[in-house]
Amino acid sequence: MNWSEVLIKDPIYLNLGGSNNCHPKVGYEKYISVDINPPGEGWSVKQDLRKPIPLPDNSVTRILSEDFLEHIKVEEIKALLLECFRLLKPGGIMRIGVPDYNNPKDYPYLKRGSDPRFPHHITLTNYKLMRKIIEELPFSRHEFYHYWDNGKFICKKIDYSFGMIRRTPDNDPRCRTTSLKQKVDVALKDFMYKLLRGFRVSEEDLSVRRGHRLHVTSLVVDLFKD
């Protein structure tokens, strides 16, 4: 696919750095993957996302980007999000999913400024950094759904009709307890955790204790152009 073919789509849904996550894959219906190494023919287009996207202003309805922004520099993140604002129609939404290095398990990597597990993570994204970047942009409003702040895990209900995020407790298979043994084990550990604390435990406390079995937990935020 080339950009002329993208332009005739109505509506236009873009998945930035999307690899093979595009139409007709479940959760990515209507989405065109924009990637430096597109997976093949069909609903994908080649583009270096550090450069301007060759589409007119106010031409895109929905933009999605998961696990891409951490691979570019902070200045490049700002420039790309500003480019997305230009592209979005009034009423358009951009959904972002990035690693959240503010969680207790991965905070030591944020403190040292690098993550040797993932050397290709150029920017160690986190709630404080992403909020600062977003608040400097002209989006009319934003909503964080899934993030760590001051040692607390915030998890609001995510409407996936606005865009798929794979690496969340809802969708990542590592977070699922499918067998009876797993369910009993989780229930027993939860009970003992509550018992030892006199049952003065919130669901948020349980969520923090369990963790999400992910290498790095996700930060999810929507940006709105009203």
List each model region and its residues.
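Conserved alpha-helix/loop element of class I SAM-dependent methyltransferases that forms part
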Residues: M1-D10
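Short, flexible hinge/linker loops that cap or flank conserved catalytic cores
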Residues: L7, K25, R213-L214
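Conserved SAM-binding loop
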Residues: P11-P104, K128, V221-F224
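S-adenosyl-L-methionine-dependent methyltransferase catalytic module, highlighting the catalytic core
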Residues: V74-F85, K89, I93-D226
